[in-house]
Amino acid sequence: MELRDLGKTGIKVSRLGIGTAALGRPAYINLGHAEDLQRNYNQAEMEARTHQVLEAAYAAGIRYFDTARSYGLGEQFMGNWLKTFNPKEISVGSKWGYYYVADWEIEAEVHEVKDHSLGRFQQQWLESEQHLGSHIDLYQVHSATLDSGILTNSAVHQALQELKEQKGIRIGLSLSGAQQAEVLEEAMNISIDGQRLFDAVQATYNVLETSAERMLQTAHEAGMGVIIKEAVANGRLTSRNQEEPFVSDLKQMAWKHQVGMDAIALAFVLHQDWADVVLSGASTVAHLESNVWANSVRLDQEDMDLLRAMAMVSEDYWGKRKSLSWN
């Protein structure tokens, strides 16, 4: 699999990466998540499943692995895999700023809580370091928004800069919501001693939600690494979705290229040269193997035009995402 630089971070990444939002905890908003886990939420068996997916990802050439403090036991599962499997020449990113509160309950009223305070950063960094050790290459603010306070919190900015200087770790932020572009624009203007604080950005971008494209390209041109999450829109761009009007055209294109709908969705993002790495969110080895076929898909202009025509109004996209059930 092709490797490239993650912007000017000095980190090498594969074009496809693996994210663990659906692996480290029993419930997530992906369509069919409960079926993927076969409704087996035993922690030891979930860790074994996670290791299988991570090993399959590595065998497929994936070299960027992404997790977060709020992904249940995601960091712990990945850390144990790193110790056991000892993969070579990989890069690891994690995130702080959300914490997991569901206590392994599927029907929990609240699954994660956002807190971008200095105290939360200090606590979660120690926890991330405990689980992942020296493997951490990129530490990201989880879901920065205009109202989360992170963009104006100079104490947190200074602490992030100190982490960068003391540990040699790159600093990033992930985005969510209809104002991704505005948040990124503000974040790019945050500097300490004349140096931009944030080295990389992780954003939602897919066939249905393209609103941040211009700013993501601008960030890439400015030297920031660009990581794309939710490329299959939490399962809406896979065969799990049989209801929405775009599904028929997506199915036909998948048949044309002899791959799954998921591979078409991922290929659309891989087609964007400003996207350094596109995360698979697979929770099974079979899904991962289907995702990897995206590397072989060559979309023509007709394909791209048809896919671009599927884009939704950003606010409508995020409204639909908010309505997805934890399962």
Q: What residues fall within each predicted segment?
A:
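Short, well-ordered coil/turn segments that N-cap beta-strands
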Residues: 11-16, 61-64, 86-90, 133-137, ...
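Structural motif corresponding to the early beta-alpha repeats
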Residues: 91-118
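Glycine/proline-rich, positively charged
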Residues: 34-37, 41, 108-199, 207, ...
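Generic structural signal for hydrophobic
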Residues: 57, 128-132, 163, 187, ...
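N-terminal binding-site loop/beta-alpha segment at the start of enzyme catalytic domains
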Residues: 1-90, 94
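Structured C-terminal cap/extension of enzyme domains
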Residues: 58, 63, 214-327
